[in-house]
Each structure stands twice: as C-alpha cells, then as structure tokens.
Design a protein with these regions (language model features):
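N-terminal donor/sugar-recognition subdomains of glycan-related enzymes
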Residues: 1
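Core catalytic region of metal-dependent phosphoesterases/phosphodiesterases
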Residues: 4, 10, 14, 19-93
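Beta-strand-turn-beta hairpins that frame and shape the catalytic cleft
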Residues: 5-12, 126-134
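Histidine-centered catalytic micro-motifs
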Residues: 17, 136-140
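Active-site neighborhood of divalent metal-dependent phosphoester bond hydrolases
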Residues: 52-55, 61-126, 130-133, 141, ...
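Conserved, charged catalytic cores of large soluble enzymes
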Residues: 144
Length: 165
C-alpha cells in the first residue's frame, strides 16, 4: 500500500496495542487525533489485553486509520478461520483474544474480522512531502543461512511467511 501526504497533516505511527482499548482511546485524546490526521497502526492490535472487541470497533470508527498486520493479528485471523471456518490456514499461537471475542461476536462476525485482518498489508510505503518511508511490523531473525540469501525478507518470527524479493 502506498500513501502520499503533501500537506502539513499530522502523521502518527503506533504499534503493539494488544487489545488495550482504553489505552488506545487515551492516546487518541492525548494527541488530539482528528479527521485531518493520519494514524498508522503498525501491527499487533490483538492479543494479551481484555478488550479486543472494543478496540476493533474503535478503530473501525475512523476513516483515517490504516492498519498493518502484525504477527499477533495474523495468529488471531488464523485461529478464527480454523475454529469458525473449519479450515487450516497456518500455524498460530493462541492467546485470549478469540475466547473473549466469541462471547460478543457471532461466528459470521468473527470470520468477517479475520477477513478484515487478512486484507491489511504487511507494510506501507509512506511519502511525506517528498520523503519516503517504509513502515512494517517486522523483526529480523537472521541466522547465517538467512543472511546469505538476499532475495528473501523474513518478517516477524517463524510464523510469518517469507516475502521473496
């Protein structure tokens, strides 16, 4: 995904919210987030905290929030698809998120949420007044073998797919 900003809009990047809806709302209030701003959530919306549904709906309220998939988001989507769609999509680590969500959302809504996650990019190319940035929720786990193969980028940990260059 490519985003270009050619004005004086505020651009914020935050990651690792991990289900903390109240903290996220306080952050938006603190930065006085408004319709002219852009917020990029750089992965890991889900897992660990206890308010995933509230956080999800809070994010959906804004047209000017962009989301990048993080490893926890990928795991949540995979678990939902396996549990409610009855098909295996890859490995995942199960935290508390799906158990909390299924108390409040229908199976159809759970699958829609998984689809929403999977539609999000792994990175965003951001240009602000001519300066270029690439934002990704990534950590490299480089072994000597991985370092030798310059055609591959390893994002996240071993649960992520390899992005071939």
């Amino acid at each position: 995904m490519d985003i270009t900003i050619d004005d004086n809009r505020n651009v914020y990047v935050v990651s690792d919210i991990h289900n903390y809806a109240d903290g996220f709302k306080r952050l938006l209030k603190k930065i006085q987030f408004n319709e002219n701003d852009l917020l990029i959530i750089d992965g890991d919306i889900f897992d660990r905290g206890d308010t995933p549904v509230e956080l999800y709906f809070e994010i959906l309220r804004y047209h000017n929030i962009q989301v990048i998939q993080g490893n926890h988001d990928v795991w949540v989507a995979r678990q939902i698809i396996e549990q409610f769609g009855h098909r295996k999509t890859g490995e995942y680590i199960s935290y508390n998120t799906v158990a909390i969500m299924e108390k409040r959302l229908t199976p159809v809504d759970m699958l829609r949420l998984a689809e929403w996650i999977q539609e999000k990019p792994y990175y965003i190319n951001l240009t602000i007044n001519g300066r270029k940035y690439q934002i990704a929720h990534a950590q490299t786990f480089l072994t000597p073998e991985r370092m030798l193969d310059k055609r591959k980028i390893y994002m996240g940990d071993w649960h992520y797919e390899i992005i071939k260059c």
